[in-house]
From Swiss-Prot:
Gene: rplD
SUPFAM superfamilies, sorted: Ribosomal protein L4
GO molecular function annotation: rRNA binding; structural constituent of ribosome
Protein name (database record): Large ribosomal subunit protein uL4
InterPro entries to which the protein is assigned, alphabetical: Ribosomal_uL4, Ribosomal_uL4-like, Ribosomal_uL4_dom_sf
Swiss-Prot/TrEMBL keywords: Ribonucleoprotein, Ribosomal protein, RNA-binding, rRNA-binding
Record family assignment: Belongs to the universal ribosomal protein uL4 family.
């Protein structure tokens, strides 16, 4: 199959298995959920009544004070007491094998092509790390909510995009399923397309 280059009167020959496969919603969902789960820190921790600092002594005698009976000061109903169902440190990571991860990326890329949300250009760069220059370039291409994917890290492009709302720059190595589906349009250079094919082959 072929992908038309937006900035040139030509087309790029690409693999059908990477950019023309059926959309597997269940697989994409599983991989995206796992990716988000793996980003979780999971380091929260609260103390139960057994773990909080304090005396185990009965605060006052059982009878004769007129107050409600109390056996300790570390219970959940006391100020400074333990938490009833205390949250503990937890590992939220989910395992996704390479075949599934690659399959999900291929599925997302293919769906982007079908929806005309994947824009391929011969090259894309800015002369200096100027947000104004990048904004003007994107405006000329009628692009706003866009992920720019380059073959290698372009520092000028990265710095220029850093202060733009709903614009992000990634190299092929930093590509992930969540970023691909988070933007309305994905702008990819021809070199990046070749690298993506090699990576997902």
């Amino acid at each position: 199959m072929e992908l038309v280059l937006k900035d040139a009167q030509s087309a790029l020959e690409v693999s059908e298995t990477t950019f023309g496969r059926d959309f597997n919603e269940a697989l994409v969902h599983q991989v995206v959920v796992a990716y988000a789960a793996n980003a979780r820190q999971g380091t929260r921790a609260q103390k139960t009544r057994a773990e909080v600092t304090g005396s185990g002594k009965k605060p006052w005698r059982q009878k004769g004070t007129g107050r409600a009976r109390a056996g300790g000061v570390k219970g959940p109903i006391w100020r400074g007491g333990g938490v009833t169902f205390a949250a503990k440190t937890q590992d939220h990571s989910q395992k996704v094998n390479k075949k599934m991860y690659r399959g999900a990326l291929k599925s997302i890329l293919s769906e982007l092509v079908r929806q005309d949300r994947l824009v391929v250009v011969e090259s894309f760069s800015v002369e200096a790390p100027k947000t104004k220059e990048l904004k003007a370039k994107l405006k000329a291409m009628n692009l706003e909510d866009v992920l720019i994917v380059t073959a290698e890290v372009d520092e000028n492009l990265f710095l220029a995009a850093r202060n733009l709302y709903k614009v992000d720059v990634r190299d092929v190595a930093g590509l992930d399923p969540v970023s691909l589906i988070a933007f309305n349009t994905v702008l990819v250079t021809a070199d990046a397309v070749k690298q993506i094919e090699e990576m997902l082959a």
